[in-house]
Amino acid sequence: MRRSLAPSQLARRKPEDRSSDDEDWQPGTVTPKKRKSSSETQVQECFLSPFRKPLTQLLNRPPCLDSSQHEAFIRSILSKPFKVPIPNYQGPLGSRALGLKRAGVRRALHDPLEEGALVLYEPPPLSAHDQLKLDKEKLPVHVVVDPILSKVLRPHQREGVKFLWECVTSRRIPGSHGCIMADEMGLGKTLQCITLMWTLLRQSPECKPEIEKAVVVSPSSLVKNWYNEVEKWLGGRIQPLAIDGGSKDEIDRKLEGFMNQRGARVPSPILIISYETFRLHVGVLKKGNVGLVICDEGHRLKNSENQTYQALDSLNTSRRVLISGTPIQNDLLEYFSLVHFVNSGILGTAHEFKKHFELPILKSRDAAASEADRQRGEERLRELIGIVNRCLIRRTSDILSKYLPVKIEQVVCCRLTPLQTELYKRFLRQAKPEEELREGKMSVSSLSSITSLKKLCNHPALIYDKCVAEEDGFEGTLGIFPPGYNSKAVEPQLSGKMLVLDYILAVTRSRSSDKVVLVSNYTQTLDLFEKLCRVRRYLYVRLDGTMSIKKRAKVVERFNSPSSPDFVFMLSSKAGGCGLNLIGANRLVMFDPDWNPANDEQAMARVWRDGQKKICYIYRLLSAGTIEEKIFQRQSHKKALSSCVVDEEQDVERHFSLGELKELFTLDEASLSDTHDRLHCRRCVNNRQVWPPPDGSDCTSDLAQWNHSTDKRGLQDEVLQAAWDASSTAITFVFHQRSHEEQRGLH
């Protein structure tokens, strides 16, 4: 018997197919082995008992995806590319990518041949021999402003960026790296400085960043504004660090982190900090080097002896940019402090500057100066301008005439009411403040007298408490007030300026959709504005020193919205005169003048700015014949001085001697305008303008070249015409001028 058929080999034999389960197993011959098909090999073999019928194979099973294919498909759905965990990040912070250093010719970061490219530096041309001789990896490259910025820069801004870059890279004055950006308000100084910072942080002729870090120091009210401007123009390409408040330890920790950043990939290369915070934490910032410092509202550094100046001067950086729309505010020595801060030594010491420049120039500008004094002063002025112009750039606001609607400025002289006149004369008789000024001294009591008279010009309600308390100068004046007078109620008819303001607001509200900004130096005057608005049912917004920085931004944004129902925006010039953009309004009233023309200029520039679409009207209210006109005349003195040194206007007329400016405590009841009287105007006969202003004169011209009106004829503002009709005795004289002729297509 064959071994394969033996009972011991039973388990190894495969059963044959049977017709039914009842059939007995019969041993048969073993079929020869055949090669298994591919389909059969895929079925896993298993042991089957010969006494059981094998399971039928499922040959019609539907096709299914392989598990590995399915997993790969799910992964492709869920997978996301790597994203840098920085908000709004859109590109590399540095100019170099990771990897090996590429050999070959250096290339500029941006194409200098692109249409509209702003090229700040162009390498000197090389001969073919020099190109072969020099190392290609050391050749200087073009410095080209990032196209995202150069495309939005206006022509004067492109010129300004190039000037700034040449100054801070020591190409204008060898060995000096500072400059003053003295453009007037509204010309885009912030954008120009952001462009400068971004360019220095990204590139240089050496194909690497010029600086690693930059610090922007500004008033606390502008810290957020700077942060927003950087975000606006650069998007997520850079992450600035803004600090204005917090605990000392927290601020120190942030500043230490900022100063410890190194290399080409600094995460936060721009620090924005307020003057106050900088002064308190300068010890941390002095520990390292900073590539560039920018000081906004730089006229704060006019005194080289104050702590802020000394703190900034101790910072380890030679590249210094000072932004100030009004570089001269009080005297030339303050101007010297600003120039000395950015470029130490180019004007000598303070003593040398005063002797060589300041005294001869001031002497020549006096109305009583001799011809020799004038000639010597002009020579020193030319010498000073020649030195300073290498590090100072200034463009006046007449450039804006291409981009902004017409601005009409009006200086409105208002007659005091009988109550104001009597209180004014009583105070001068009883306080006798002029006696303290005869020796040229300014005592505490004389300063107090100035404040009292300024408040009286605004409204008698502001000095009512002094009358009740019978303070110096106001003894026995309580009986002058009308019977039953209530200081808590607003009575516009008791103040000449308040009466005119009431008419201006009423006419504007009834005849147009214009909004109005009211500006005053005193919060007490703002209180009167509030009372007047409540009585007249005007919706209003108020911004003063008590409002937080965060809330200011929201209030301004709401007021500027076309859908906002607010009609009046009340502004304290001390708290919010700088940096605010109030283009939602196109009429602004300066209710009282400041000694410093820069403060008034800043406040008046809130509405005539980029984005304004309407004709702007500026009203400067002055009480005729009073201390307010003397203050206004002093402003003209400072502005003429600034114009001579900064604007290079040689033909600015000097109408006021220094002796005349000391006549503060006088009252000329009969004068329609003390300022006009002192001009000795040749274009007016019997207080009526006979000859028009010279061609080309505008708002920046001397006051003698404005229009002079003693009635409503000739006024360019319908609202003021209507107000003059309504208050024929309240308005005595108006100076008015327009910024430029209206251009076609600009409304």
From Swiss-Prot:
Binding site for ATP: D183, E184, M185, G186, L187, G188, K189, T190
GO cellular component: nucleoplasm; protein-containing complex
GO BP, sorted A to Z: chromosome organization; determination of adult lifespan; DNA damage response; double-strand break repair; double-strand break repair via homologous recombination; response to ionizing radiation; response to xenobiotic stimulus
Reactions performed catalytically: ATP + H2O = ADP + phosphate + H(+)
Residue ranges annotated as motif DEGH box: 296-299
Broad class of the protein's primary localization: nucleus
Coiled-coil residue windows: none
Localization, UniProt: Nucleus
Positions of post-translational N6-acetyllysine modification: K515
Tissue specificity note: Hardly detectable in most tissues. Dramatically increased in thymus, spleen and testis.
Domain Helicase C-terminal: 500-653
Phosphoserine sites (modified residues): S38, S572
Domain of life, source organism: Eukaryota
SMART domains hit by this protein: DEXDc (SM00487), HELICc (SM00490)
Record InterPro entries: Helicase_ATP-bd, Helicase_C-like, P-loop_NTPase, SNF2-like_sf, SNF2/RAD54-like_C, SNF2_N, SNF2_RAD54_helicase_repair
Span list, region Required for chromatin remodeling, strand pairing activities and coupling of ATPase activity: 2-9
Post-translational modification: Acetylated. Acetylation promotes interaction with BRD9, and subsequently with RAD54, which is essential for homologous recombination (HR). Phosphorylated. Phosphorylation at Ser-572 by NEK1 specifically in G2 phase allows efficient removal of RAD51 filaments from DNA.
Region (Disordered): 1-42
Recorded GO MF terms: ATP binding; ATP hydrolysis activity; ATP-dependent DNA/DNA annealing activity; helicase activity; metal ion binding
Pfam families reported for this sequence: Helicase_C (PF00271), SNF2-rel_dom (PF00176)
Keywords: Acetylation, ATP-binding, DNA damage, DNA repair, DNA-binding, Helicase, Hydrolase, Metal-binding, Nucleotide-binding, Nucleus, Phosphoprotein, Zinc
Note in the entry: The nucleus of a mouse embryonic stem (ES) cell contains on average 2.4 x 10(5) molecules.
Function noted in UniProt: Plays an essential role in homologous recombination (HR) which is a major pathway for repairing DNA double-strand breaks (DSBs), single-stranded DNA (ssDNA) gaps, and stalled or collapsed replication forks. Acts as a molecular motor during the homology search and guides RAD51 ssDNA along a donor dsDNA thereby changing the homology search from the diffusion-based mechanism to a motor-guided mechanism. Plays also an essential role in RAD51-mediated synaptic complex formation which consists of three strands encased in a protein filament formed once homology is recognized.
Family: Belongs to the SNF2/RAD54 helicase family.
Assembly with partners or alone: Homohexamer. Interacts (via N-terminus) with RAD51. Interacts with NAP1L1. Interacts with BRD9; this interaction orchestrates RAD51-RAD54 complex formation.
Protein name: DNA repair and recombination protein RAD54-like
Taxonomic source organism: Mus musculus (Mouse)
